[in-house]
């Protein structure tokens, strides 16, 4: 599978291939690689089926499963998931358990140590045990379908997976709960940000840290939150190792991208008088599927390893999900001391022994390694797991919600069967194990529900690590689900989410302080409010590449307290730089905010953003190779950034002064330098003819296979981190695209067949499959495919060719 956003994406489906540098397809197998493809026609007996099942596929390989029982449909879903995505399933399963080194070798060991400490298996066990007998039975049947594939094809695995020499284990029902917990972990905030904040605090101190960790444009800086760290020696053993492991995990976990959006249009805003729903997700792991069985039909996006359609349409209700950026991960600094061989931590003035559990790592090509993981009352000590020799100093404990008595897995199934918005809302309220914006619609109504489990903190905001020895920062249970934000049929006639802050200041519960920037959501709101909508306008919205940040930047340039000082600062530059700054200033004032691939002004605008970050922060956080700079850039991608916050305000920030010069600089002086630097950088990268510049020549889509070989591209890309059609890059590092909306779906209730969608990465992870990376053209051209619900329309979309699965003996 390949992605339009990542030149390194395929290994995130077969992550072991990336870690182990998988062999080239040419000559790496002794058998015909076509044998690794299960048939798509004919008759195939499978032990475990009760009755015959039909599987048809559409032009891009989306399966339609037709069965006489829901159990047989789930069995077949397991078989089909494994047929197309066994590499994804195996590697994410190993990643979630902290066992990737068994397949990939020692290079994966640091991530394994981190995942063993986090211990998702404990969460998965809690979640599975709390599920109803009905759901457990569904998961068991699904697992048998996966194992039917493994039994038949374990010696004919896809070539990139087979190259690892690893024999996959048979699937267990509990493994699906583990995949769900990995998804939950990836969609949670803000562990990575807290780790990065500590790295930054080591560089600049806790007094300057608030300027680097803003929450939102209209929120005050987190000064009180940073006061928790005042006076502490923040030299934490193993911190940089934890930081690198967390960042590596983020690269490997294809369930960890939090970007996405939802939009529901009420009948009064629709041209046809019927509701519409549109959604996109930046997760690269989605797999479209359709199930038709007695008393159950649904089509939409699933994740291989999970027997569920997580967002889609069932003939009556459409539902979608995106990250709400909920903060349910807290880091605690623990005071430690060692006495002999025993390790203790301080709790409200008293020393208590840590809990110890032993973990054994089976590393490919090496002897087993046995290590201890230490835990406090808050959770596992991450730096102990990464090999830091803990003595008298700080440990880093991670606390996450417990999932005992959690009915989330039942709730997702109930949601997929809901027949109206009211029932969808009821089901969504029971989703507690994962923090999401759930948006849903039927023909006449729309709704929204925030799901999840959010801690009640006695003090603090959870944005930065807390002193674990001080009970003032402990959790007191979880927020009452009745306080979770929701809405139904709002008077404005639309609901839009794009990872922005979804609650007002002073709301009655702590949801998060790690929101994404507001511009994507603001653009969606503006488009949704402008006249009547239909499916064509929603397609245009999903491909929109206009940024509202450019207008805010212009407003800042022309503000009463900035306009004259900025012009003076430009005039004070040396002659050559002055001319460049003047040109950049005038062109940015005229820029219309359309970040199209062929735009010269868009290129200049993005160059200015990049250069301003370096001019403002690099003197204190650099060099660019330093851990501090890498942490700063990473946090800029995870939530509302200090880069944006300083451009739009923060005139009194200590970061405006360039510590490398004798004089004291202010904001106008640094902005003037940044304007000139944008032109200079553009000349180096794009040439001297500045009118011929093109944003897409700096910023492109590329597709590569598991070996790093280019499949397609580079193709010029428009957009950036603030456009609805997102094409984010590392602000302060380079213009390489980090994520885009991989999956898109639209449901138009005025149509006889309401659901249409596309998936950029293609259905299959097997490089020899015709459905490998075959979503690229449709994604580029906005060619949505219909997924019909009425049997008389199946042949038009899925054709006549079918694979008939029959009970085996």
Curated annotation (Swiss-Prot):
Instruction: Show the InterPro entries listed in the entry.
Output: Ntn_hydrolases_N (IPR029055), Pen/GL7ACA/AHL_acylase (IPR014395), Penicillin_amidase_A-knob (IPR043147), Penicillin_amidase_dom1 (IPR023343), Penicillin_amidase_N_B-knob (IPR043146), S45 (IPR002692)
GO cellular component terms listed in the entry, alphabetical order: periplasmic space
Q: Name the gene behind this protein.
A: quiP
Query: Where are the membrane-spanning stretches?
Result: none
Instruction: Enumerate the GO terms in the molecular function aspect.
Output: hydrolase activity, acting on carbon-nitrogen (but not peptide) bonds, in linear amides
Keyword flag Hydrolase: yes
Q: Where is the active site?
A: 261 (nucleophile)
Q: Quaternary state and partners of this protein?
A: Heterodimer of an alpha subunit and a beta subunit processed from the same precursor.
Biological role: Catalyzes the deacylation of acyl-homoserine lactone (AHL or acyl-HSL), releasing homoserine lactone (HSL) and the corresponding fatty acid. Possesses a specificity for the degradation of long-chain acyl-HSLs (side chains of seven or more carbons in length).
Protein name, UniProt field: Acyl-homoserine lactone acylase QuiP
- EC number assigned by the record: 3.5.1.97
Q: Beyond the main fields, what else does the record say? A: AHL-mediated signaling mediates quorum sensing in many species of Proteobacteria, regulating hundreds of genes, including many that code for extracellular virulence factors.
GO biological process terms, alphabetically, are:
antibiotic biosynthetic process; quorum sensing
Per the similarity annotation, which family is this? Belongs to the peptidase S45 family.
Catalysed reaction(s)?
Answer: an N-acyl-L-homoserine lactone + H2O = L-homoserine lactone + a carboxylate
Instruction: List where in the cell it is found.
Output: Periplasm
Q: Name one Pfam family in it.
A: Penicil_amidase
Give the matching Gene3D superfamilies.
1.10.1400.10, 2.30.120.10, Glutamine Phosphoribosylpyrophosphate, subunit 1, domain 1 (3.60.20.10), Penicillin Amidohydrolase, domain 1 (1.10.439.10)
List where this protein forms a coiled coil: none
The UniProt record lists the keyword Hydrolase: yes
């Amino acid at each position: 599978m390949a992605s339009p956003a990542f030149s390194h994406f395929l290994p995130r489906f077969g992550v072991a291939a990336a870690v182990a540098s998988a062999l080239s397809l040419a000559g790496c197998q002794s058998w015909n690689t076509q044998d690794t493809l299960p048939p798509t026609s004919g008759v195939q007996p499978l032990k475990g089926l009760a009755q015959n099942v039909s599987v048809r596929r559409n032009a891009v390989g989306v399966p339609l499963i037709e069965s006489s029982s829901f159990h047989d449909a789930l069995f077949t879903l397991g078989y089909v998931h494994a047929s197309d995505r066994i590499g994804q399933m195996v590697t994410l399963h190993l990643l979630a358990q902290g066992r990737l080194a068994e397949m990939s070798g020692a290079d994966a060991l640091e991530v394994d140590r981190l995942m063993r400490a986090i211990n998702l298996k404990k969460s998965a066990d809690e979640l599975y045990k709390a599920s109803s007998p009905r759901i457990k039975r569904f998961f068991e049947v699904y697992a048998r379908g996966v194992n039917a594939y493994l039994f038949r094809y374990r010696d004919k695995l896809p070539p990139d997976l087979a190259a690892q020499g690893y024999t996959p284990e048979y699937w267990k029902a509990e493994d699906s709960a583990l995949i769900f917990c990995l998804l939950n972990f990836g969609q949670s905030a803000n562990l990575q940000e807290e780790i990065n904040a500590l790295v930054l605090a080591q560089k600049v101190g806790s007094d300057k840290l608030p300027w680097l960790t803003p929450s939102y444009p209209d929120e005050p800086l987190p000064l009180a939150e940073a006061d928790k760290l005042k006076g502490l020696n923040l030299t934490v053993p193993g911190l940089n190792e934890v930081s690198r492991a967390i960042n590596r995990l983020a690269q490997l976990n294809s369930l960890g991208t939090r970007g996405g959006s939802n939009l529901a249009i009420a009948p009064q805003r629709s041209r046809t008088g019927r509701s519409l729903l549109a959604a996109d997700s930046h997760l690269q792991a989605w797999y479209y599927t359709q199930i038709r069985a007695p008393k159950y039909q649904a089509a939409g996006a699933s994740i291989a390893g999970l027997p569920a359609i997580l967002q889609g349409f069932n003939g009556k209700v459409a539902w979608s999900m995106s990250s709400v950026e909920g903060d349910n991960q807290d880091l605690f600094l623990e005071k430690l001391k060692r006495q002999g061989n025993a390790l203790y931590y301080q709790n409200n003035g008293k020393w208590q022994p840590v809990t110890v559990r032993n973990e054994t790592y089976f590393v490919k090509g090496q002897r087993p390694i046995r290590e201890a993981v230490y835990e406090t009352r808050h959770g596992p000590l991450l730096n102990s797991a990464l090999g830091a020799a803990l003595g008298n100093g700080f440990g880093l404990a991670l606390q996450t919600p417990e999932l005992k008595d959690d009915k989330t897995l039942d709730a997702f199934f109930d949601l997929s069967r809901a027949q109206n918005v009211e029932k969808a809302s009821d089901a969504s309220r029971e989703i507690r194990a994962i923090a999401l914006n759930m948006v849903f619609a039927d023909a006449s109504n729309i709704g929204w529900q925030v799901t999840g489990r959010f801690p009640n903190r006695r003090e603090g905001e959870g944005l930065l690590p807390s002193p674990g020895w001080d009970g003032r920062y402990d959790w007191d249970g979880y927020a009452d689900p009745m306080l979770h934000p929701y809405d139904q049929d709002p008077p404005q006639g639309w609901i839009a989410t794009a990872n922005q802050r979804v609650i007002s200041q002073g709301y009655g519960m702590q949801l998060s302080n790690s929101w994404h920037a507001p511009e994507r959501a603001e653009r969606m709101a503006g488009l949704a409010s402008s006249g009547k909508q239909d499916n064509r306008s929603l397609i245009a919205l999903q491909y929109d590449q206009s940024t509202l940040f450019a207008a805010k930047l212009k407003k800042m340039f022309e503000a009463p307290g900035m306009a004259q000082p900025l012009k003076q600062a430009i005039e004070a530059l040396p002659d050559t730089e002055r001319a460049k700054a003047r040109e950049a200033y005038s062109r940015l004032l005229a820029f219309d905010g359309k970040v199209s691939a062929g735009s010269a002004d868009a290129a200049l605008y993005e160059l200015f953003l990049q250069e301003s970050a370096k001019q403002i922060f690099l003197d204190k956080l650099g060099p660019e190779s330093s851990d501090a700079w890498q942490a700063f850039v990473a946090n800029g991608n995870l939530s509302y950034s200090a880069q944006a916050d300083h451009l739009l305000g923060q005139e009194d920030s200590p970061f405006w002064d360039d510590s490398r010069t004798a004089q004291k600089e202010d904001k106008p002086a640094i902005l003037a330098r940044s304007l000139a630097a944008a032109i200079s950088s553009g000349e180096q990268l794009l040439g001297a003819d500045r009118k011929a510049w093109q944003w897409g020549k700096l910023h492109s889509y590329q597709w590569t296979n598991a070996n790093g070989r280019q499949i397609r591209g580079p193709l010029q890309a428009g957009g950036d981190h603030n456009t609805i059609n997102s094409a984010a890059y590392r602000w302060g590092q380079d213009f390489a695209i980090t994520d885009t909306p991989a999956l898109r779906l639209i449901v138009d209730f005025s149509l006889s067949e309401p659901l249409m969608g596309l998936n950029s990465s293609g259905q299959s992870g097997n490089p020899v499959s015709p459905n490998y990376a075959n979503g690229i053209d449709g994604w580029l051209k906005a060619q949505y495919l219909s997924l019909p619900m009425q049997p008389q329309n199946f042949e038009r979309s899925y054709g006549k060719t079918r694979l008939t699965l029959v009970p085996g003996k």
